[in-house]
């Protein structure tokens, strides 16, 4: 391999018995057993046991002085381990290396934690990320990330896609998430924006005739962070010309099947099911439903319109209200304490409470039910609830009644919490498998109550369905988009759309978004001009590489599959970024910081 080593530690097996090897790596552990020193030597491929006998005094003295995380080089002979001392958990578990020479390449100060400690706080791990990355799980995660990226590149290359870089310094467009801004020194008072997506550039590459484009690139969004968000994230960005929506979906569905098979030996469905956005929201309260959970909403809005119980009747009679039931088979066994905990849980999502009915005996109707709300419901409503939910003896029905968004968010989250719980898994409410699907036919627009205007649900370059073009000017709320999301186990793996390729339609969409012609020209004139030069029909997708690898690795957070991530406060604990900068740098950028107003003293 090199003059310093002949093999990786973790790849030395019994086939090399009797051979001389040179190994380099880090000391995982050093043990002194009756005058013989054992060293677990680690590199990126795993561990090997090194045995140091005292019959080589110089080597043995060096072995006595080494400690955990010393970087060392050893030479020695591979031999079988004594019978009964084999380690089946290691690739090298049947052999050991009898050390002839040991060189300390670089000692280590005492590490702040043991690398095999699985109970470290994330703050500790991110502060000492260099050491954290030495741990086998992190090594696995980042190598898996590399493998996924390589499989993507191989697939797209075979399909005729060209890897083209697009600018990192671009124009700020205040639509959507907040931009990261970069001041221009040579253009005082002007700013670049780091890209939230290469969206417009990749469309212009289609206008330029490149036909099939991709890149694996960094994108940036200055937004509040969650477990699956980072201020900078990696996108597998793809665009193609002259394909229909169905052909685009088929192509990238095949890509994901190939990547999952080659990266982690998982066979995804031969054909991903397709679900309309409207159906996903009706059944699951989410546009990225986790189909592993065998629970669904039952629509009860009409049933509750005439009940003498305002908790249900008020939202049922409201234009933006909704009432649903969530039947949990066998849920009658859920304790009152657990119900109280669920009530607190849905409150996180804005729910004011959590009504419930335990079904003891369906045949007895009202008398077979247990709940404080039964007295507020008339017999016809009770009968309809039991009928529509398909309730059986021993079930529980939870209810959501509020604005549709609150109901969807809160009961949707409750559905997942129950499904993923020990109770859900023990009662067949969760299937531990891979459940991909396409969600299609998204609304083109959603109404922003605060700004009193329509906003793009995806982005303003998504094409409306051909039969809905007339709604752009008459009723934007009716307009459906040629948009599609690939969902897997409740995560959006990627999303895309067929794009607008005619300048006149793009202008109509801008107007529907309350962007007048002058504003559109100022912000997107270069795109409108490009579309006039015979732009081809085109569309594409963007996949979140971080999310894909997180799912494959079974990690708790995307921070576990990124080498140097930011915290939920958008900070890098390793380098202490962001940080203050020198006054001279600010002057060169023509920037002056406004001092924080001091608080008045009492």
Curated annotation (Swiss-Prot):
Annotated region (Aspartate), positions in chain: 199-202
Its EC number(s): 6.1.1.23
GO cellular component: cytoplasm
UniProt xrefs under CDD domains: AspRS_core, EcAspRS_like_N
Subcellular location: Cytoplasm
Catalytic activity line of the entry: tRNA(Asx) + L-aspartate + ATP = L-aspartyl-tRNA(Asx) + AMP + diphosphate
Biological role stated in the UniProt entry: Aspartyl-tRNA synthetase with relaxed tRNA specificity since it is able to aspartylate not only its cognate tRNA(Asp) but also tRNA(Asn). Reaction proceeds in two steps: L-aspartate is first activated by ATP to form Asp-AMP and then transferred to the acceptor end of tRNA(Asp/Asn).
Subunit structure: Homodimer.
Descriptive protein name: Aspartate--tRNA(Asp/Asn) ligase
Organism expressing this protein natively: Cupriavidus necator (strain ATCC 17699 / DSM 428 / KCTC 22496 / NCIMB 10442 / H16 / Stanier 337)
Source organism phylogeny: Bacteria, Pseudomonadati, Pseudomonadota, Betaproteobacteria, Burkholderiales
Name of encoding gene: aspS
């Amino acid at each position: 391999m090199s003059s310093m080593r002949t093999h990786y530690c973790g790849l030395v097996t019994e086939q090399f018995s009797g051979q001389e090897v040179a190994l380099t790596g880090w000391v995982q552990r050093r043990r002194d057993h009756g005058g013989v020193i054992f060293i677990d030597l680690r590199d990126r491929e795993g561990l090997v046991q090194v045995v140091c006998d005292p019959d080589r005094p110089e080597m043995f003295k060096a072995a006595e002085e080494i400690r955990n995380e010393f970087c060392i080089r050893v030479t020695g002979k591979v031999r079988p381990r004594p019978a009964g001392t084999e380690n089946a958990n290691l690739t090298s578990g049947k052999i050991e290396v009898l050390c002839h020479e040991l060189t300390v390449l670089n000692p280590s100060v005492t590490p702040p934690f043991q690398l095999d400690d699985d109970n470290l706080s994330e703050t500790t791990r991110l502060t000492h990320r260099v050491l954290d990355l030495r741990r086998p799980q992190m090594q696995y995660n980042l190598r898996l990330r590399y493998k996924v990226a390589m499989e993507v590149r191989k697939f797209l290359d075979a399909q005729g896609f060209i890897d083209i870089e697009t600018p990192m310094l671009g124009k700020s467009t205040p639509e959507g998430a907040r931009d990261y801004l970069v001041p221009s020194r040579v253009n005082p008072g002007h700013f670049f924006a780091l890209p939230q997506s290469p969206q417009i550039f990749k469309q212009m590459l289609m206008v330029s005739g490149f036909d099939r484009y991709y890149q694996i690139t960094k994108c940036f969004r200055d937004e509040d962070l969650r477990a699956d968000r980072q201020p900078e994230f990696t996108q597998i960005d793809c665009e193609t010309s002259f394909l229909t929506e169905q052909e685009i979906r088929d192509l990238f569905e095949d890509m994901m099947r190939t990547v999952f098979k080659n990266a982690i030996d998982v066979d995804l469905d031969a054909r991903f099911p397709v679900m309309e956005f409207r159906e996903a929201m009706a059944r699951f309260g989410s546009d990225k439903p986790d189909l592993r959970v065998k629970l669904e909403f039952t629509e009860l809005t009409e049933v509750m319109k005439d009940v003498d119980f305002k908790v249900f009747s008020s939202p049922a009679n409201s234009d933006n209200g909704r009432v649903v039931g969530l039947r949990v088979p066998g849920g009658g066994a859920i304790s009152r304490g657990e119900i109280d905990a669920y009530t607190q849980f849905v409150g996180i999502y804005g729910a004011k409470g959590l009504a419930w009915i335990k079904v003891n005996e369906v045949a007895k109707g009202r008398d077979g039910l247990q709940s404080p709300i039964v007295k507020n419901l008339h017999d016809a409503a009770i009968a309809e609830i039991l009928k529509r939910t398909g309730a059986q003896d021993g079930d529980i029905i939870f209810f959501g009644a509020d604005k549709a968004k609150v109901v969807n968010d809160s009961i949707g989250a409750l559905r997942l919490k129950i499904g993923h719980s020990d109770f859900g898994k023990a009662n067949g409410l969760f299937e531990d498998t891979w459940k991909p699907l396409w969600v299609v036919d998204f609304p083109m627009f959603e109404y922003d109550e605060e700004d009193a205007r329509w906003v793009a649900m995806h982005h303003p370059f998504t094409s409306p369905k051909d039969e809905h073009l007339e709604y752009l000017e008459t009723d934007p709320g009716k307009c459906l988009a040629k948009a599609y999301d690939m969902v897997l186990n409740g995560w959006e793996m990627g999303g895309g759309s067929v794009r607008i390729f005619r300048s006149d339609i793009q202008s109509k969409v801008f107007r529907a978004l309350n962007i007048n012609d002058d504003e559109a020209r100022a912000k997107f004139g270069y795109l409108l001009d490009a579309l006039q030069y015979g732009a081809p029909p085109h569309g594409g997708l963007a996949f979140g590489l971080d999310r894909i690898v997180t799912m494959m690795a079974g990690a708790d957070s995307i921070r576990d599959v990124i080498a140097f991530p930011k915290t939920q406060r958008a900070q890098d604990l390793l380098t202490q970024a962001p940080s203050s900068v020198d006054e001279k740098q600010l002057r060169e950028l023509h920037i002056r910081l406004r001092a924080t107003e001091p608080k008045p003293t009492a």
